[in-house]
Amino acid sequence: MQDTNTGSEAAANQEAASSLEEKRDDMKWVVQFNIALNEDAKRYYGFWNSVFKFAVLVFGSYSFASLFVGASMAYSIVAVIVSAISAGQLVFDFKDRQVRAKIQHERYSKALTALDSAKNINELELVQAKIDDIGCDDIDTSDICDALAVNVAIDRMGLDPTRKVDIGCFKRLTRYIIPWARPEYKS
């Protein structure tokens, strides 16, 4: 009878260990994915998005100024001032994006270390709560949903693009991330 109990206990322990590792693996996938996506969105999408906005702004301001150059120089001066202020705002936004990405990267890296150190499900859930708090309000969904950034992140990290991990703020984001990341959507 004791051998049966011992065997059942061993099986339960083995199942608990497997569940722990599976949950740890899922959570690490989420963190690794977001580290890669955060970095590539910053590098590829964020930069070219700012360049495109700036180009449109300059062209629009020039066209606007040209319309009124004959009527009044005041309009041209206003257009130039507005263009300069807007360009400064674009630069500020880009720098702010870089800073936020760096902070998130550091926090996600610490989360990976914490995941490796967790010894049981309860400790993993504590780490999960911290992961859920990392930049959920700061995540720019236009970056997250950008197919180029997602595909680059998936490829560079060698991650399985079909996995869905629904934890915290990523529960609502995976609906956007995963479909765009699947191979059949790649150009």
Predicted feature descriptions by range:
Residues 33, 79-83:
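Generic alpha-helical secondary structure signal
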Residues 64-76:
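Membrane-interfacial hairpin junctions
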